[in-house]
């Protein structure tokens, strides 16, 4: 049907691709709520000149374009994960634990937890030192909710709030790694002491 419409008009065809994708569409959009249960926008524009029609997309198309460009330029560093693990274990001793066997995870990603603090407390304070960590779920962090994924693995709500993730994007010398790890350990211990006073 869209092919026939294309033959009779120069209008841009905007289609909902949640259930069916038609190659004759100029623009497709998704109903993420129906697909995932979460309410957000999903729009893909196929021709760059369509970006001028921002009102159609509430600028989501520009965001998607920028994300695509960022992904094209994305780089990962796979040689420093094991060093980070050992340095973190040395600095944090019994206060660090792992939800998964890190040898079975992506070589540029490290997932761990620190006892008796919420990950968001450490995320905020380390950002001041330009050390960016995440709990892996931006939407949950924004709502101050614990990780749904960790809970699905069988951990309780309190434990799931401890989840921390690092992604390695550049080569670091051992001294740089030690500096980052020491900062993480220092900030963690400060937060832990402050929490004990509450």
Kindly give the residue locations of the regions a language model identified:
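Amphipathic alpha-helix from the class-I
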Residues: 62-79, 172
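Catalytic PLP-binding core of fold-type I/II PLP enzymes
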Residues: 1-27
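Conserved PLP-dependent catalytic core of the aminotransferase class-I/II
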Residues: 74-125
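Conserved C-terminal alpha-helix-loop-beta "cap" of PLP-dependent enzymes
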Residues: 109-164
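General beta-strand structural signal in soluble alpha/beta enzymes
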Residues: 13-17, 28-32, 99, 133-136
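PLP-dependent enzyme catalytic core of the Aspartate aminotransferase-like
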Residues: 148-198
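Active-site PLP attachment segment
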Residues: 22-69
